[in-house]
Structures are given as structure tokens and as C-alpha cells.
């Protein structure tokens, strides 16, 4: 091989590496978007499951309707209301998400944290408790 052919071959390889690097960047961006969407959908599913279980528990039976008319709350409904009032659960969920490597701040909520780096916005939110 002469020097020109070698130079052309190296230039061609450099172009291919550049294209592969661009494709890798695109894949990384798509993966980040999919992780954000997956996290958002998981949160939504969990919220909907809780809401469904609360509505199933709170569905009044004939006896419960009579109790509700007289101002006495049915035991299941009372428990459901207590669960809704419980504030620590939401905080615990945010802490768990942060530990799993996702932002919980209003600036970058749901997006993955790069290399598990700490986010000052997230930390200030979690330390407000």
C-alpha cells in the first residue's frame, strides 16, 4: 500500500468513527428520554393503583350509606382518609426516587441524575422536611 491509500483508509475510518459517535450520542439521548418517560409512567401507574384501591375500599355498602347519613364514618372510609392524610409517604417516595438516581426537584423532575451526582435543588427540597 502506498502512503495515499493508507491516508485515505485512515480518513475513511475516522469518518466512520465520527458517524458511530453521533449514533451513540443519539442513542444516549433516546435512552434518557425513555427513562424519563418510564419513570413518569411508573409514578402515574402507582398513583392510579393507590387511587383505585382507595375508591374500592371507600365504595359504600348499604349499611355504610346509613352510617354516612347519620354522620358516622365507615371504618374502611376512615382508613382511606387516614392514608390520604398521611404526609410522610410522599416524602418517602421522593427520597426513594432520588436514591434510585432521578431528580425530584421542580427544575429537572424525573430526569436521570448524571453519574449519581448530587443536585442542590433536589437536596434543598428533601431537607425542607
From Swiss-Prot:
Family matches, as Pfam families: YabA
Keywords recorded for this protein, A-Z: Cytoplasm, DNA replication, DNA replication inhibitor, Metal-binding, Zinc
GO cellular component: nucleoid
The record's free-text note on cofactor binding: Binds 1 zinc ion per subunit.
Subcellular location: Cytoplasm, Nucleoid
Cofactor: Zn(2+)
The keyword Metal-binding appears for this protein: yes
Gene Ontology annotations of biological process type: DNA replication
TM annotation in the entry: none
Binding residues annotated for Zn(2+), in chain numbering: 103, 105, 119, 122
Subunit relationships: Homotetramer. Interacts with both DnaA and DnaN, acting as a bridge between these two proteins.
Function: Involved in control of chromosome replication initiation. Inhibits the cooperative binding of DnaA to the oriC region, thus negatively regulating initiation of chromosome replication. Inhibits the ability of DnaA-ATP to form a helix on DNA; does not disassemble preformed DnaA-DNA helices. Decreases the residence time of DnaA on the chromosome at its binding sites (oriC, replication forks and promoter-binding sites). Tethers DnaA to the replication machinery via the DNA polymerase beta sliding clamp subunit (dnaN).
Family the entry assigns: Belongs to the YabA family.
Record-linked NCBIfam families: PRK13169.1-4 (NF009643), PRK13169.1-5 (NF009644)
Protein name: Replication initiation control protein YabA
Gene name, Swiss-Prot/TrEMBL: yabA
Amino acid at each position: 500500500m502506498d502512503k495515499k491509500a493508507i491516508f485515505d483508509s485512515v480518513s475513511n475510518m475516522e469518518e466512520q468513527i465520527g458517524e458511530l459517535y453521533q449514533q451513540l450520542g443519539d442513542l444516549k439521548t433516546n435512552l434518557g428520554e425513555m427513562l424519563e418517560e418510564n419513570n413518569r409512567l411508573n409514578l402515574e401507574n402507582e398513583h392510579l393503583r393507590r387511587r383505585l384501591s382507595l375508591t374500592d375500599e371507600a365504595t359504600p355498602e348499604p349499611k355504610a350509606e346509613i352510617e354516612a347519613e347519620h354522620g358516622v364514618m365507615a371504618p374502611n372510609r376512615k382508613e382511606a382518609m387516614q392514608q390520604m392524610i398521611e404526609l410522610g409517604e410522599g416524602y418517602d417516595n421522593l427520597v426513594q426516587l432520588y436514591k434510585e438516581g432521578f431528580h425530584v426537584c421542580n427544575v429537572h423532575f424525573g430526569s436521570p441524575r448524571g453519574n449519581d451526582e448530587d443536585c442542590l435543588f433536589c437536596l434543598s427540597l428533601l431537607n425542607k422536611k
